[in-house]
C-alpha cells in the first residue's frame, strides 16, 4: 500500500532551509507514530510531499487513521502506484479502478503531472474523461459540480491512481516549535487548548494540580493520555502531578473570601513556572477564556500573569463556551469533561471580578510560601507512556483475567471507531459496548449483580477505568487481557 502525504500550506511558503527542517521533522514524526503498526514501513521525504509505503494490508485503515491525526499534514492520498505505457493505457487503468464508482454519477477528471512528457495534464484529462464517458453509459461529465472527481497523478514514468483523499488536521509538525507546559484540569477548556498548541507544532507537557484525590488524578491522566496518544504520540512528554490540597487549605485559612480565586490561580502559575524552569519549558498554556468566570476578567488575568515572568499562552481567550464544547466533541474529550468535577470554583463564595494588586499582595503576605515550595519539590513526574505501567502498580487489587465465567459480561470500552474496525467475536460470553468516556456516567445503570471484564486494545484505558470505577465504589470490575 502507498500513501502520499501533502504538506500543510504554511510549511510550503517557508524559506528553503526552514521548509526542509519542517519536512525532516514531520518525516520523523510519521515514522515514530507508524512504527507500531508495521516494522517494515518506509517513509520517504520529497520537496513537496512525503511517501509512506507499507506491506501489511491488515493495517491499512489503522495507518490511514493515524496519519489524519499527525500535525503538519494537510491531506493524505491513498494511491495505487503503476507503470504506464501511454495515455490510452492511463485511461484503461482508470477505467478498471473507477468504473463502479462512476456508474450513475456525474464526474470530472483532474490530473497533476511532474516530469517531462509528450502530453500535457489537460491532454490526459480530456482523453481519460472522454473515454470514461464513452465506456460507462450511465456516467455523465460535469466539470463544475461533479459528484465524483477522478484524481490522477503522473510522476515521470509512474501513474498514481488515487483511491481516496483524507483530510489531515493541518498545523505545524510537533517539534518545530518549543515545548510548552499545559495546566490541565480535565475539563473542556484545558483539553482543547492543549490540542491547539500541539497542532501549532509544540510538544505539550502536562501539569496537573490535584484538588480532588486519586479519582480526580486518574480522570485527568485519562484525558492527557488520550490527547497524547491521539495527536502527539510522536514525542515523549511529561505528566507532572502536584498535590495542591495543602495550598488550598492555606488559602482557605489565611486569604479573604473574595480574593481566593485569583490567589489560587497565582499560586498555580508560580508552581507551574517553577516546574517549567526545571525542565526548560518556555511557556505555560491555560484554557482561560475572557469573561468566562470571575478570575478571567482582564484585570484578574493581568494580576495572574504578574505572579510569574513565564509566558502564559491562552489560545481560547476569545472563544465562547459553545465553540469550545464543540471542539472538545470533535476531539473526543467532551465526555471526559462532562464527568470531571470543577474544583477551582468551589472555594470562593463571592469572588472579585476586579482584584486590586495591593489587596492581593496583602492577602498573599499571610500565606506560608514554604508550603508552595514543598508541594512543588514533591511533584511527581512520569513519562506519559508509563501511565499504563504505573496503573498496573496502582491497581494491584484489580484482577486481570484471560478467561471468563459464563455469568461474566465482557465490556468493550474502545471507541466506536475502534470497535467497528476490529469487532469482538467471542463465544460463551455476553459482550456489551460502552466506550470508555461514558463509563463514568453510565456504568451505574448496568446490572450490578454481574461482574464486568473491561477490554481495550492495549490494556491501558481498561486499567485506568478499572481504578476509576473502584474509586467510585464499584467492586465488580476486572481487566480482560486475552
Curated annotation (Swiss-Prot):
Localization of this protein: Cytoplasm
Primary site of residence: cytoplasm
GO-annotated cellular components: cytosol
GO terms assigned for molecular function: ATP binding; CCA tRNA nucleotidyltransferase activity; tRNA binding; tRNA-uracil-4 sulfurtransferase activity
Ligand binding (ATP): 183-184, 265, 287, 296
Cited Pfam families: ThiI (PF02568), ThiI_fer (PF22025), THUMP (PF02926)
Keyword Coiled coil: no
Residues of the THUMP domain: 61-165
Pathway terms, separated by semicolons: Cofactor biosynthesis; thiamine diphosphate biosynthesis
Keywords: ATP-binding, Cytoplasm, Disulfide bond, Nucleotide-binding, Redox-active center, RNA-binding, Thiamine biosynthesis, Transferase, tRNA-binding
Keyword Protein biosynthesis among UniProt keywords: no
GO biological process, any: tRNA 4-thiouridine biosynthesis
Ranges for domain Rhodanese: 404-482
Membrane-spanning segments: none
Disulfide bonds: 344-456
Catalytic residues as annotated in Swiss-Prot or TrEMBL: 456
Record-listed E.C. numbers: 2.8.1.4
Catalysed reactions, as listed in the record: [ThiI sulfur-carrier protein]-S-sulfanyl-L-cysteine + a uridine in tRNA + 2 reduced [2Fe-2S]-[ferredoxin] + ATP + H(+) = [ThiI sulfur-carrier protein]-L-cysteine + a 4-thiouridine in tRNA + 2 oxidized [2Fe-2S]-[ferredoxin] + AMP + diphosphate; [ThiS sulfur-carrier protein]-C-terminal Gly-Gly-AMP + S-sulfanyl-L-cysteinyl-[cysteine desulfurase] + AH2 = [ThiS sulfur-carrier protein]-C-terminal-Gly-aminoethanethioate + L-cysteinyl-[cysteine desulfurase] + A + AMP + 2 H(+)
Record PROSITE patterns: RHODANESE_3, THUMP
Superkingdom per UniProt: Bacteria
HAMAP family in the record: ThiI
NCBIfam families: ThiI_C_thiazole, tRNA uracil 4-sulfurtransferase ThiI
Protein family according to the UniProt entry: Belongs to the ThiI family.
Task of the protein: Catalyzes the ATP-dependent transfer of a sulfur to tRNA to produce 4-thiouridine in position 8 of tRNAs, which functions as a near-UV photosensor. Also catalyzes the transfer of sulfur to the sulfur carrier protein ThiS, forming ThiS-thiocarboxylate. This is a step in the synthesis of thiazole, in the thiamine biosynthesis pathway. The sulfur is donated as persulfide by IscS.
Protein name per the record: tRNA sulfurtransferase
Species this chain originates from: Pectobacterium carotovorum subsp. carotovorum (strain PC1)
Gene name of this polypeptide: thiI
